[in-house]
Amino acid sequence: MSTFRQRALDEASAHAAERFFVEKRPVSAYFGENVFDLAKMRKYMSQTAYDAVIAAVKFGKKIDRAVANEIASAMKTWATEKGATHYTHLFQPLTGTTAEKHESFVTVKDGQAFERFSGSALVQQEPDASSFPSGGLRNTFEARGYSAWDPNSPVFILDETLCIPSVFVSYTGEALDMKVPNLRSIQALSSAATSVVNLFDKSVKAVSVNVGLEQEYFLVDEALYNARPDLKLCDRTVIGHTSAKDQQLSDHYFGAIPSRVEAFMKDFETEAYKLGIQLQTRHNEVAPN
């Protein structure tokens, strides 16, 4: 074994399990606390604004500018009370990652600073689309793109930033992200399904779509990661031995979860619960981890 590899193994084995986000409260006490959900909308918005958001989510109704200003003000009030200082339109471009540009709530006028967030800033941002879906040679003014608020997904706070789930389209309205095609397919499915359901019940206006969540991940110690140029450059294994196929290392579905992995899972669960993400099961995947 090379000296570099041995040093990486020694460093990895010296790392102890460590928790960073420890909550003593029951999950029900902090579930969704960082999400601007329906309950918080009722608290911070007027009934008119609340009804406008519900109509936009359920039936695709447009939100007029005056109501958008009220919604933005309510979001800003809630977010600043939670310690947020910036906001961003968060979207998933075709690069397979996320993209965002953080803007401050703070505005200075006559030497005085105050927080401001308008409806126009909530509804749309105008970023540079020349880098999507890949780095291009176009001038930025020749590649306009627009991120637009998607009210189907609730806004949330992450690292003192109000994250606004958004879609990303070109100047001509073409989809430049992963979400627009999904929303269009949901709309098409709802339209077709509603026509069928109306044969039995005329009161049905739309059909909603639900999907189950499953997230797999592989955890690699930082020392071992730094010893693998294939992981650093390609984000995948290119070199090395074939993995164990017969589960000799007890890396099966019901295998014991290592202490450091379990500590990571608990931290992940704590933050996920605060974002209103329901989690049910912890287990080893059927692969070396």
Where are these regions (language model features)?
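Glycine-rich, acidic/polar active-site loops that bind/position phosphate-bearing ligands
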Residues: 143-289
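Short acidic/polar alpha-helix capping motifs at helix-coil junctions
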Residues: 14-20, 35-43, 179-180
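Generic secondary-structure boundary/loop-capping signal
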Residues: 28, 88, 102-103, 214, ...
